[in-house]
């Protein structure tokens, strides 16, 4: 038997779609006689209301918009999987919008599309342009959750990792072994997460009463593998370090390959670690040691947090900090 829809109920009951939705939502504005008629048809058709049917009366579209830079896709695709699965479980539609690149996308145009499609809420990814994005969603009073950075704002939720703790613990471990020549590699120097990673590194050096020179120990690189690889082929002709820590797996792979092509043995001559733990870390030779972030879970948590905000559910906090795991493979000595 064909599954009944809200259109079938409205037609059989002789009422509008909005009236059916109001009955489903228990609205008091519907006359008792009309309510009884609609409920009778719902029972006869065995109609099971979904979020869209409920949303017609509440002016909700049950749609969540995701906005992220195209160049981050390799790092966030698993996160999008978590967002999609959580959205389906909670009967929300997910619409994806991409900006051209980190910090360079037409954010005003994207936000105009989000507003035009009447998305109930927005999930943003931490990027160089995040401050502008947050201001835009606040300006238009769109509920939002940011993934990848802590946001202390009553109107914005966030799902993040403690980036300072990650680098502090890693760097502190190497400094305790007497391995002081450590550099940090990232394509996003202005990113709040990157700033936090650098701060954690600085603190470890300070606690060991060792000098930290940001001008030489923090290296800005490209988001494109080929450019990063070329940059480090040149760098390793004159430099070798105890540890290179990269903010993303892709940059970590570029470092490993450039080092090997300069006859630097990984991990005997130099160790390499990166963050995220995507498939890049497994196809690298030697395999790349990483900080595993629960990417899929972060996406699912962001959806759950956003839906609670949308439904005005009571929340202990809008700032959700998730854990991480150190995964040691062949690019480090452990």
Name what the model sees in each region.
Residues 1, 5, 59-172, 176:
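Alpha-helical recognition/docking segments in bacterial nutrient-uptake
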Residues 1-61, 333:
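N-terminal helix-turn-helix DNA-binding module of bacterial transcription factors
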Residues 17-19, 56-72, 181-188:
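Short beta-strand segments enriched in small/hydrophobic residues
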Residues 65-67, 118-126, 183-186, 237-251, ...:
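Periplasmic-binding protein-like
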Residues 68-78, 97-105, 159-169, 185-231, ...:
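Hinge/beta->alpha junction and helix N-cap segments in small-molecule ligand-binding domains
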Residues 180-181, 212-216, 266-271:
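Short acidic capping loops at alpha-helix termini that bridge into adjacent secondary structure
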Residues 233-334:
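Flexible loop/turn connectors
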């Amino acid at each position: 038997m064909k599954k009944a829809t809200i259109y079938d109920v409205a037609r059989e009951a002789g009422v509008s779609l909005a009236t059916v939705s109001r009955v489903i939502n228990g609205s008091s504005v519907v006359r008792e006689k009309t309510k009884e008629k609609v409920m009778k048809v719902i029972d006869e058709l065995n109609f099971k209301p979904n979020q869209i049917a409920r949303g017609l009366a509440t002016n909700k579209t049950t749609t969540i918009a995701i906005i992220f830079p195209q160049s981050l896709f390799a790092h966030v695709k698993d996160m999008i999987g978590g967002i999609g699965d959580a959205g389906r479980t909670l009967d929300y539609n997910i619409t994806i919008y991409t900006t051209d690149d980190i910090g360079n996308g037409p954010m005003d145009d994207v936000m105009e599309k989000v507003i035009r499609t009447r998305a109930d809420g927005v999930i943003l990814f931490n990027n160089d342009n995040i401050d502008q994005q947050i201001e835009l969603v606040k300006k238009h009073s769109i509920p939002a959750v940011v993934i990848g950075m802590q946001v202390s704002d009553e109107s914005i939720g966030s799902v993040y990792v403690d980036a300072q703790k990650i680098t502090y613990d890693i760097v502190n471990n190497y400094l305790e072994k007497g391995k002081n020549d450590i550099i940090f590699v990232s394509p996003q120097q202005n990113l709040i997460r990157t700033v936090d990673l650098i701060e954690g590194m600085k603190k470890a050096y300070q606690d060991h009463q060792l000098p930290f020179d940001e001008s030489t120990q923090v290296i800005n690189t490209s988001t494109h593998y080929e450019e990063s690889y070329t940059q480090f082929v040149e760098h390793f002709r004159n430099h070798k370090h105890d540890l290179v820590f990269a903010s993303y797996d892709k940059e970590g792979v570029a470092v490993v390959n450039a080092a090997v092509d300069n006859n630097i043995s990984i991990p005997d001559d130099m160790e390499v670690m990166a963050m995220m733990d995507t498939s890049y870390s497994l196809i690298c030779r030697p395999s790349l040691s990483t900080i595993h972030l629960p990417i899929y879970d972060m996406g699912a948590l962001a959806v759950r947090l956003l839906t609670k905000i949308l439904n005005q559910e009571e929340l202990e906090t809008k700032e959700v900090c998730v854990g991480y795991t150190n995964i040691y493979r062949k690019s480090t000595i452990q």
